[in-house]
Amino acid sequence: IVSRVEDATRVAAAIERLSVEQSTVIRLSFIEERPHSEIAAVLGLPLGTVKSRIRLAMNRLRDLLDDAT
């Protein structure tokens, strides 16, 4: 259980280091579990832009988490 809490803390800290655009789509997609089409509608963005931001944000998160270990 401690490891899960530590992992969640690391991920939350990494999300805070993302750009506002990236952290917003990550929160909406993975924390609020909204579909990409809904995120696009809420943010007033094309679906492709939302998918691209999620992909880029995930890549950045991986880099941040790899650097932290």
Per-range role (PLM):
Residues 21-22:
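The N-cap/first-turn positions of alpha helices
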Residues 25-29:
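A short pre-motif secondary-structure segment
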Residues 31, 37, 43-68:
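DNA-recognition helix of helix-turn-helix
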Residues 3-4, 18, 35, 60:
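Exposed, low-complexity/repetitive linear segments and helix-based recognition motifs
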Residues 1-16:
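Acidic, proline/glycine-rich intrinsically disordered inter-domain spacer in sigma factors
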Residues 2, 40-41:
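Short coil/turn segments at secondary-structure junctions
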Residues 17-18, 46:
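Histidine kinase transmitter module recognition
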